[in-house]
Structure formats: structure tokens, C-alpha cells
Amino acid sequence: RHAVAREQRGHRKLPRKLHDPTSTTPPMILIPVIDLMRGQVVRAVRGDRQSYRPIVSTLCEGSDPVVVARALCAHCDSNRLYAADLDALTGGTAQAAVLRRILQAMPELEFWVDAGFADADAAQQLRERIGPEAERVVTIFASESLRSRDELARCFAERDGDRERGVLSLDRRDGQRLDPAGCWELPQLWPSRVIVMTLERVGADAGPDLATLREVQARSPATKLVGAGGIRHAADLDAARDAGAHAWLVASALHDGRLPPVRR
């Protein structure tokens, strides 16, 4: 899985956008993604985690997480990065040392992390393992992982000043919601930012799932939605923006050179 954007805080720069400056439509924010497995970046395809292989990218050599993270953020002119910890998501131990190394190497990074958190306590435990750098971690709470409605409410009740501590990801695969806690039906408990994750579109060159995006938007029109999966080229980003997406999580199209570098 992989996995919306947050406005500028202090001196940190915003991720840049692919956008026509003459347009009055809000620009699309690109959030680059890395999928981490056993200490390296792998290529995600259709959410079939057991078949993932080390990334091969036009942007950099090798699959070292720091090298790949820097290349993606430079290409997107972004200080925001999403990471899916596949070790944790497949029942293993979260890669705290790898996450810490990325944060230490990129001191301006706002790091969105999905490690299959079942509850707020699990997220806090990973923060403690990462150490002081975890102040820059934005926790992703995914509908496929959250265990109860009570935990859904608890995860987004905690705040850091005026900043929400996490983002909700609404997950589905092949038309079926991955949602043991019933998150999809509880928009009153959603945070201000929600990811719409269609797993079979991830790395599949299949186009974005705009129907599901519109379905979620209808449930909560004021929520900032971030799509995930399916982007093939810049025209897909335009269509996603027109459908109401605030941002999109992207990996394969960046590694394959199908999206141009973002410039100021």
C-alpha cells in the first residue's frame, strides 16, 4: 500500500505542483512514495506484497532508502514523503532504524509513515523507537489495519497544537473495502485529510480510481482527499485534480520517467 498534504509550517517549503500558472483551478500536489521491505526500497505492484522486488529507477542507482528518497523529493521539489513499511504491514517488526536514517539524512522532511498501526498506542511505540526525529513523522492510520471504531476516534482526537497528528487512509481492493473498523461509514470521525487508496491500481499503469474518489468526496465534501495508485502521466493528474483530489501519492510514474521534474 502506499500511500494529503499539509499546508506550510514555519520555514518549510511546500511540495511543488504540476500546474498551468494561468489556471484558476487549485494545483495538484505530488507526494512521492517509497515502499520499504527488509531495509530497501521495492516496487509495489497491485498490492501483492509478497512479489515486490527491489526498485529499478530512472532517477537514481540502487534501492538504498536514503538515495531513493532524496531522488524522489528532488524530482518533485517536495519536502514531503510517504513510506509504507512492508515489514510491519506483513506482520513483522517496523523498520525504525531505516525510518530514522531517512529522517536524519533529510532534516527538512515531513515523513508520512504507514506501518500497519492497529491503534494509537502502536503508533506511539514506533515514534519512541525512532527517537527525537519522530517529531516530523505524520502517522498514517489505515482502514485495513485499525481494529475498532473507538480506536478510529482516538487516533484523530490527539493533536499537536493546532495540527492533527495523523491522516486516515480508506483502503479498498478489487471493489471491496478493507475496513474491519467501519471507517468508511464514519465520516464524522474522519480527520481533515484522508487518503483514498485503491490497492489494485498501485504500480499497475491502470489510471486513477476517480469513481471512488468522488464517492468519498460525496461523504465528506470539506475533507482534503489524497488519491493513491494508478497515475500514468500528467493528464491523469489533471483528471484527478478536476475530480476533487487535493494531492496524489505517486511512485511508479516517477521512477519510470513518465512525469517531468517539478520546477519552481
Spans of features found by a protein language model:
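Catalytic cores of alpha/beta
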Residues: 111-133, 186, 213-220, 225-247
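Glycine-rich phosphate-binding active-site loops on the catalytic face of alpha/beta enzymes
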Residues: 132-151, 198-203, 230-236, 243-263
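Short linear motifs in low-complexity or flexible loops
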Residues: 3-5
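Alpha-helix-loop-beta-strand connector modules within alpha/beta enzyme cores
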Residues: 92-115, 155-166, 205-227, 231-232
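Hydrophobic faces of well-ordered beta-strands that scaffold small-molecule active sites
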Residues: 29-34, 81-83, 111-115, 139-141, ...
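N-terminal active-site wall of soluble small-molecule enzyme domains
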Residues: 72-75, 79-130, 210
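Short catalytic helix/loop segments, enriched in acidic residues and glycine
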Residues: 48-70
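Conserved anion-binding
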Residues: 36-53, 121-202
